[in-house]
Amino acid sequence: MTVTAERKTAIIADNARANGDTGSPEVQVAILTERINNLTEHFKSHAKDNHSRRGLLMLVNKRRRLLDYLKRKDAERYTALIGKLGLRK
């Protein structure tokens, strides 16, 4: 269910704005998206795991807040990110 260190490093490298960037909204949203996708797969075989479902909802809301922030600050980066991650339209 967790993101492995190698996978997280790859996600950071793909979405970083500069070398060593780990805290930009783009990187945070990409890591959250990976965790959300992992939990979604988990629920396909564990449908009644309501404790983890709460965690999933918290991750989705955190990602939503970060995306709202990014959209408010820089709409071009927002549209590029949702296109790259395959979110929304």
Swiss-Prot record:
Q: Name one GO cellular component term.
A: cytosolic small ribosomal subunit
Q: Which GO terms describe its molecular function?
A: rRNA binding; structural constituent of ribosome
Q: Which UniProt keywords apply?
A: Ribonucleoprotein, Ribosomal protein, RNA-binding, rRNA-binding
Q: Which InterPro entries match?
A: Ribosomal_uS15 (IPR000589), Ribosomal_uS15_bac-type (IPR005290), uS15_NS1_RNA-bd_sf (IPR009068)
Biological process (GO) annotations held by this record are: translation
Domain of life of the organism encoding this protein: Bacteria
Note the SS bond partners.
none
Keyword flag Magnesium? no
Family as reported in the entry's similarity comment: Belongs to the universal ribosomal protein uS15 family.
Q: How does it assemble?
A: Part of the 30S ribosomal subunit. Forms a bridge to the 50S subunit in the 70S ribosome, contacting the 23S rRNA.
So what does this one do? One of the primary rRNA binding proteins, it binds directly to 16S rRNA where it helps nucleate assembly of the platform of the 30S subunit by binding and bridging several RNA helices of the 16S rRNA. Forms an intersubunit bridge (bridge B4) with the 23S rRNA of the 50S subunit in the ribosome.
The name this protein carries in UniProt is Small ribosomal subunit protein uS15
Source organism lineage? Bacteria, Pseudomonadati, Pseudomonadota, Alphaproteobacteria, Sphingomonadales
